[in-house]
Amino acid sequence: MSCCKTIKLVKSPVRGDGYIIDDITNKSISFMENSDSPFFTLITYNTPHSPMQVPDSFFENIEVNLQGRYADKENKIKTQAALAMVENIDYNVGKVINSLKKNNKYENTIIIFFSDNGPNGNRWNLEMKERKGSTNEGGVRVPFFIQWPKKIKSGLVVEQITSVMDVFPSLIDLMNFDSKNNFDGISFKKYLSNPTLIDNDRKIFSYWGQRISVRDNNFILDHNDSLYDLKNDLSQTKPVNNKFSSNYLSLKKSKDDWINDVISNYDNSQRRAFTVNYDESTYTHLPARDADFTGDLTRSSIHANDSFIENWTSEEDYIYWNVNSLNSGMNKVSLYYTLPETSSGTQLTLEFMDNKIKKDIMIPHNPTLEGMKEDRIKRIESYTKDFKKITFGDLFFEKGESILKLKTSKLKGKKSIDFWLLVLEKTE
């Protein structure tokens, strides 16, 4: 059954209007208010997270009163900014709910609120062990709220552990959709009517950076195979391997089986190719974030997200992506760049298999970096700048997998472009 509008990938990056969380909220509200049929809206707030930018009206009203177990490592200004971001999220979630109420959609709308991982800094975290990047509770346990005024009783606290993988099958189940698919997750619908029901056989695995933990409803076995009783020791301070040996052996076997079943078939060194010419998509974005490069080229930050590639001083160096063209077809290519005035006339070449196109970059564009003025503390991510878009040309992609290369074929001056993004638009 079809229920929802489909929003396709946009042709080009868009410039937002004000603080990003406010802007995302306003755009989401506009979409929902103008939806006459049932809709699904995924509102992906990117806070609290660095860079620590938040409006003064929220930042100045925050006092940091709670300290976590790693208080000696805490940056109070960063914590203040993070808490201000949470206040801003709360404000914007309120706007969404008020809009649903105003438009008589609230009672029959399922609203889910949750986060992706633990805090990205050392701050109060319910005394749980560690933070984002850890497979202990402090790194992976997050709040989860669900409401459906028309169907779910308010005030329930579900005791059963669940995973983000459970959200999709649960929504399918709640809406009584028929599905013959085998999901990785498990529907939690039954717990919403019986919140004290427990499945003692359910286990959740967390894997990050070669560290693996597994937990059931009462215990966690961490990456060092230390067992903790989470009902009585949420902070994971006292291993209980000997006291609860049967629980230890059960979780250890589950962990070993999972490693053999999943990790043994997982090769982190093999990166999947980026797909082009997919039947259901007109546009493909290939950002610097996902590119590889050679020679003296560098990334603007060790953190790839929203970075750009710079220090292009040699015709021998190039930027590349492993690309799988699912079908043969022509693509219109757009490129986002900056270039100093002294390098005007630099020629770029883009090639895939036996096909290539060239472009002389005649218009210099060399803006300054942005972002530092609004940061509450010095960021670890890349600063950004206003990259210029040009039409590069039309490139034919043969069906198959190969390397897409962006080269400086003629360097004028001492420095080629700083590169941010390629956009491919399927034209046939």
Label every model-predicted segment.
Residues 1-39, 45-54, 68, 72-74, ...:
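Formylglycine-dependent
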Residues 14-24, 76-91, 105, 129-144, ...:
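A short beta-strand-to-alpha-helix junction
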Residues 35-41, 105-111, 199-201, 216-219:
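Loop/turn elements at helix/coil->beta-strand transitions in domains of secreted/extracellular proteins
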Residues 39-44, 86-89, 93-96, 110-115, ...:
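Beta-strand elements within well-structured catalytic alpha/beta cores of enzymes
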Residues 51-56, 60-62, 98-151, 163:
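Histidine-centered active-site microenvironments of extracellular/periplasmic hydrolases
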Residues 119-124, 132-135, 156, 160-232, ...:
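C-terminal cap/loop subdomain of S1 sulfatases and analogous C-terminal strand-loop tails that border
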Residues 248, 252-428:
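Extracytoplasmic
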